[in-house]
Every structure is written in C-alpha cells, then in structure tokens.
A protein has these predicted regions:
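Ribokinase/PfkB-type carbohydrate-kinase core domain
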Residues: 2-14, 64, 76-90, 102-172
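Short, glycine-/polar-rich solvent-exposed loops and beta-turns at beta-strand/coil boundaries
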Residues: 92-94
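Glycine-rich phosphate/adenosyl-contacting loop at the front of the ribokinase-like
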Residues: 1-64, 69-83
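Short alpha-helix plus adjacent loop in nuclease-associated cores
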Residues: 96-101
C-alpha cells in the first residue's frame, strides 16, 4: 500500500463486536437459537482508523480501554495494522466496550446494543494531554461513540491548532 504521508489522529471508540446470526430476530422475551457466532474488533472510531490506514495515512488511535481480554484484542489488532497505540488510554475501573449484534440471516436486518465502557469515560484532563498530538496532525477523525464532552473538547483543540476535523455524527 502506498503511504500518503498524512498524519491522522483518530479519537473515538473501540468495542469488541459479538455478532450472532439467527433465523429471525427474537421478539421481546423470546429465545432464538443462533446459527453463527463471530467476535472481532469494532467501534466507529476504530473503523475510521482502519479506513484511514487502508488509505495510506499514518494513524494514531486514541481510545480508552479497560484492563481486560477485550483490550488485548484491541491492541493486538491495532498493532497488526501498524497503528500507533502510544496514546491509547486505560481505565482501572471500567471494562473495554462491546457491541451485541443480532443479525437475521434471511433479511440481514440487525439489532445492536453497544456498551461503550471505558471509551465513554474519557476525562477533560486526558483530552488536554493530547494537545501536542492533535497539533501535529493534519486531520482529526472523530465520532459520537465516546462521551460528547470529550469530543467537543478535542474538536475545540483541533480548531485552535488549525487541524482539519472530520466528525461522523454516528451513531445519532
């Protein structure tokens, strides 16, 4: 892959996707036997980082993880993709997020419950510690799968530093 040389900071979510396929989505109170289960990396922020990496950008991923097996999945995946993980934050009190995804194998309709976990606990002080990183970036990519106050603060920092901001308003 050609390296485009753009320095991109991605500020956002990482969750582990837990996906099950079923013959139909369950009604309230119903249990449905699934046919396939898959587990893998996800989250809108992480997905932005993967897309930027595949486009050839130099990506630094900023998210917050717990101290758990899902955090290991996050770091292993990011390292395999050669993303800079030096600014990943950690929580001692909250677990890494996950998404519970049910997919109807006939219609492909889905239902998703996302538990944002640690990436929803990013503090003002943690955002402030990223000012130099943001200032060295050409782009800041972010979305609304972390606490909104942290997104507002990091976007304000980027604007002050003259950094281009791409805000995906998902999951709204």
């Amino acid at each position: 892959m050609e390296h485009i040389g753009k320095k991109v900071t991605v500020f956002g979510s990482f969750v582990v996707d837990l996906m099950g396929r079923t013959p139909h989505l369950p009604a309230a109170g119903e249990t449905v036997k699934g046919t396939v289960f898959k587990m893998g990396p996800g989250g809108k922020g992480f997905n932005q980082g993967v897309a930027a990496h595949k486009a050839g950008a130099d990506v630094t991923m900023v998210t917050k993880l717990g101290q758990d097996a899902f955090a290991d999945i996050a770091l292993n995946t990011m390292n395999e993709l050669h993303m800079d993980t030096g600014r990943v934050l950690y929580s001692d009190t909250t677990e890494t997020g996950c998404a519970l995804i049910m997919v109807d194998e006939n219609s492909s309709q889905n239902e998703i419950v996302v538990i944002l976990g640690a990436c929803n606990t990013i503090t003002d002080q943690e955002v402030d510690s990223l000012e130099d990183l943001v200032g060295q970036s050409e782009y800041l990519l972010t979305q609304l799968e972390t606490n909104v106050s942290s997104v507002e603060r990091i976007v304000d920092t980027a604007y002050r530093k003259g950094v281009k901001v791409i805000l995906n308003t998902a999951p709204v």
